[in-house]
Amino acid sequence: MTEVSKLKVGVLGGTRPQGKGLALRWAAAGIAVVLGSRAADRAESAAAELRERAGVEHITGLDNAACAADADVVLVAVPWDGHRDLLGSLRDELAGKIVIDCVNPLGFDKQGPFALTVEEGSAAQQAEQVLPDSRVTAAFHHVSAVSLADLSITDLDLDVLVLGDDREATDVVRALADTIPGFRGVYGGRLRNAHQVEALTANLIAINRRYKAHAGIRVTDI
């Protein structure tokens, strides 16, 4: 098992539901977390809320650049339309670090959610292009922000597909997934296959709407 208990995880988009929910769960599991936002005061306000909810002190809030510089591993949980520009502005701060991209390029119309076409192939591959000196992975696409935020749900019952071309980096991300009760990190292939994982989120949203659920996925026979 890869040791991750001493790592500090930065969350870009840490004031938004997905990033904030993962930060809450990691902090509750004993992982130090730093939230990133365009405004440091907004990030610190969110961090104060999570400290109270999780009953811990190891959550801080900084602006995005300071968050990226301070963390050992950085989760990208920002809106798709600002994805490229934000990562491009943080190239130096993210150099040499494991970056976990959980962004889903989706559109919505009267028929529901659908996957957008990404020039680079996927959000994760775009991150890889923009951050050539970082160790880019893709994971945490299929996690319900509602379930993450509800600490009364003690077992989230979910497999987290982890993609990437760096074995050590994907092992770290899998181990970070495993720290959250009910999560299991599962290697899901090379980064070039991330578009399939990102697009599947549209199907899960459709399932959730039809069945009034917070669906995830499980991989069998492993």
State what each model feature region is.
Residues 48, 88, 125, 175:
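Active-site phosphate/pyrophosphate- and oxyanion-stabilizing loops and adjacent acidic/basic residues
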Residues 53-60, 132-135, 183:
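A short helix-to-beta-strand connector/capping loop
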Residues 158-222:
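Active-site-lining helix/loop region of Rossmann-like oxidoreductase modules
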Residues 2-49, 179:
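NAD(P)+-binding Rossmann beta1-loop-alpha1 motif at the extreme N-terminus of oxidoreductases
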Residues 54, 58, 62-98, 104-111:
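Rossmann-like NAD(P)-binding element
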Residues 6, 44, 70, 96, ...:
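A glycine-biased structural micro-motif
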Residues 103-144, 150-152:
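Rossmann-fold NAD(P)-binding glycine/threonine-rich loop
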